[in-house]
Amino acid sequence: DGCFIAASAPNPSRWGILQSIDDNNHQKADIRMHENDFFNEDLLCALAGVAGEDNVLMSEPMREHTTFKIGGPADVFVTPDTEQGLVATLDTCYRCDLPLTIVGNGSDLLVGDKGIRGVVVALGKGLSDITVDGTHVTAAAGALLSDVAAAAAEAGLTGMEPISGIPGSVGGACYMNAGAYGA
């Protein structure tokens, strides 16, 4: 019995289909999944197949992933460590019509005691590349703002100092229009 590693588009009734693929890439079976049935072991196996086995957790306490240290469990918590893993994880969630929440560093993120239903995708260390080329700084969504400011300073660039004290990530800062200390 192999993992379920492929997904096909959901039909209009909000059902998704996971396809079971054996070790020789032959389709074995289709598993129908409804939007409320995402605790299925086959789905966890599918997500592990695209994001990495160690990167998929069930009932993960969100308090471990927020700067306020509060929050109940995420039904499924995924931390893809490559861009390809992220794209494949999002594709699987969309194709199976799963509830999806994307988080960064968890700064200013308030999660209730009941947690987050569905799949939480966290952009972290594997998606935090920072490159400096002359006067241009390029940073991935999971890069911490403090690390971006430090990389700019190390390259002799100025202007990023105000973000060094913000505990967020680039993706979260862009999405939420973060700012503090004149940033």
Each predicted region: which residue ranges?
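Low-complexity, intrinsically disordered or signal/transmembrane-proximal segments
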Residues: 19, 26-27
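A gly/ser-rich beta-alpha-beta helix-loop segment of oxidoreductase catalytic cores
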Residues: 149-155, 159-183
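Ser/Thr/Pro/Gly-rich low-complexity, intrinsically disordered segments
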Residues: 9-10
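N-terminal glycine-rich flavin-associated loop
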Residues: 62-100, 112-157
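N-terminal flexible segment immediately upstream of the FAD-binding catalytic core
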Residues: 29, 33-84, 117
